[in-house]
Amino acid sequence: MASSSRTALPSAVLALRLLTLALLAASLAVIAADKLTLDFGGGLPPKKITFKDVYAYRYVLAIAVIGCAYTLLQIPFVAVSIAKRKRMIGGSENVALFLIFADVIFALLVATGAGAGFGLTYDAKSAFGGSKLPGEVVRFFNMAYAAAGLMLLAAAAMALIIMLSIYSLVR
């Protein structure tokens, strides 16, 4: 009984890390797949727009990649804590504090990615006519909203990880 309660917090953190990884990977896939082709007619060639053409969407993609890499680096720490039946991730207070500080930095970074995606998408959609936009343009913006939303959920999962880590540190 004591060993299962001892690994309950690290197990919850592992589940949240895996959820964070899945959300960031989904955000990465959605923003990378977001494409738009505008046909202006009149003999002009169609213009293809992807995340590469919009700085904020490139930022969303970059943060998703960085967040995935960071989460993949953190998963072994949690797995070792579970395997050793340690309540505190990292083994010592100093390592746990360092990991919490790193989590805070990356949670804020992921939140800025979500904010950049939401902000630009809202402004661009409003500037180009909002509800009067053609269906393909609306789909382009909605996919960007989806990527930013997934990233925001990942930031929330990281915030929960931080709370659980702090709780295990002070407990």
Swiss-Prot record:
Cytoplasmic topological domain: 1-11, 81-94, 167-171
GO cellular component, one term: plasma membrane
Membrane among keywords: yes
Membrane topology, record value: Multi-pass membrane protein
InterPro entries on file: CASP_dom
Location relative to the cell: Cell membrane
Transmembrane regions: 12-32, 60-80, 95-115, 146-166
Keyword Lipid metabolism assigned: no
UniProt-listed Pfam families: CASP_dom (PF04535)
Protein name: CASP-like protein 4D1
Source species: Oryza sativa subsp. japonica
